[in-house]
From Swiss-Prot:
Protein name, as recorded: Adenine phosphoribosyltransferase
PROSITE patterns attached to this UniProt entry: PUR_PYR_PR_TRANSFER (PS00103)
Catalytic activity: AMP + diphosphate = 5-phospho-alpha-D-ribose 1-diphosphate + adenine
Keywords: Cytoplasm, Glycosyltransferase, Purine salvage, Transferase
Record GO terms (molecular function): adenine binding; adenine phosphoribosyltransferase activity; AMP binding
Pathway: Purine metabolism; AMP biosynthesis via salvage pathway; AMP from adenine: step 1/1
GO cellular component terms attached to this protein's record: cytoplasm
CDD domains the record matches: PRTases_typeI
Documented EC number(s): 2.4.2.7
Function: Catalyzes a salvage reaction resulting in the formation of AMP, that is energically less costly than de novo synthesis.
Species annotation: Mycoplasma mycoides subsp. mycoides SC (strain CCUG 32753 / NCTC 10114 / PG1)
Quaternary structure note: Homodimer.
GO BP annotation list: adenine salvage; AMP salvage; purine ribonucleoside salvage
Amino acid sequence: MNLKEFVVDVKDFPKQGIVFKDITPLLNNKDAFKYTIDQMADFIKQLDVDVVVAPEARGFLLASAVAYAANKRFVLVRKPNKLPREVYDVEYSLEYGTNHQQIHVGDLKPNDKVVVIDDVLATGGTMQAIIDLVKLSKAEVIGMSFLIDLTFLHDVNLFDQYKVQKLIKY
């Protein structure tokens, strides 16, 4: 299935000069959504992983379904002040400024093997922050799965040390 058919480019969103990849048509099509989840679940079943980790918000949509399909635990990574218990916190750089990602202390167990799922790989900043959170939890990232890879925004060898799945490349 050609998943690109279900992604719509929205120019100048959320700001001038950005071309936003809208995945809602994919989510709205039961066959495309099922195919996406099945592809990601098959990928993580090939890895010896314990946990699926994903950042908000669109990462949650994919990763929770994949975790269910692969019978794996699901752990959330969120922006500050969204998780009610003690958290690990990592600051990371954005194009303009910094942001934070957080994970509950104790959600990942020492030596847990983790696959991270997100909708889009752009510069890799969010993903690196998640890797750092996993390390703080004394767990290990084994692999990553992305619906979309914006190859023009990062080095071609980014995250080569991991098993990486990319369903759509631009």
